[in-house]
């Protein structure tokens, strides 16, 4: 089955689902209206993707206009620098760890969220011999922690489901790069600890969301 953007338990809304399982019911069938803020973030991600896939530097794209969801985003020197800051972190980690670098990797999450075909996207995934790393670019102003971050935990666990079949990783690492804060935050732990955290925090939340949806469906059927 082809992958789909997750709706019932999207990784980006995982914290909201944990705190309020009923939010899945309220958001059911709704499409989020595009915003200039989200469009701008997507444009910065696109510059970073070009750099990592083409082996270029972000400054090469200054002046280009990237259209996302009806909004035009110019690649200014400031945007290019933010993208480059992230790209430099990814390249440095890849050089240090070795292995394979995967850019914008689709990560099936249906095994965890129980939504057929659901998937997320890892901005950058490094598959080393002994370490698996998922790196996430956050282009916003709000500080985001990497430790115990549900979104990154889902991405990392899903990457582990794929690559852990043929690799015996000693550690897994979630990395958040926030250029606006000039910060790089990490969460490093053994694979079994990540699996335990998922089992204790994400699995129960998914079950509560499923229960809420079933309750509404039963009520609507009366």
Cite the ranges covered by each PLM segment.
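Metal-dependent nuclease catalytic cores that hydrolyze phosphodiester bonds in DNA/RNA
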Residues: 1-132, 173, 185
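Mg2+/Mn2+-dependent nuclease catalytic core
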Residues: 97-216, 220
């Amino acid at each position: 089955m082809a992958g789909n953007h997750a709706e019932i338990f999207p990784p980006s809304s995982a914290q909201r689902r944990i705190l309020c399982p009923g939010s899945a019911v309220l958001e059911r069938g709704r499409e989020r209206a595009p915003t200039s803020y989200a469009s701008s973030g997507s444009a910065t991600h696109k510059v970073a993707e070009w750099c990592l896939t083409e082996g270029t530097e972000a400054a090469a794209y200054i002046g280009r206009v990237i259209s996302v969801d009806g909004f035009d985003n110019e690649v200014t020197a400031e945007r290019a620098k933010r993208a480059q800051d992230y790209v430099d972190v990814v390249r440095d980690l890849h050089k240090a760890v070795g292995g394979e670098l995967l850019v914008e990797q689709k990560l099936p999450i249906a095994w965890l969220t129980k939504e057929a075909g659901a998937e997320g996207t890892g901005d950058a995934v490094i598959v080393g011999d002994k370490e698996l790393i998922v790196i996430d670019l956050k282009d916003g102003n709000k500080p985001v922690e990497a430790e115990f971050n549900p979104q990154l935990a889902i991405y990392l666990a899903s990457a582990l489901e794929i690559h852990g079949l043929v690799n015996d990783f000693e550690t897994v690492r979630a990395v958040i790069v926030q250029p606006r804060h000039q910060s790089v935050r990490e969460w490093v732990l053994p694979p079994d600890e990540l699996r335990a955290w998922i089992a204790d925090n994400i699995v129960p939340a998914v079950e509560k969301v499923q229960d809420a949806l079933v309750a509404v469906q039963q009520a609507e059927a009366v």
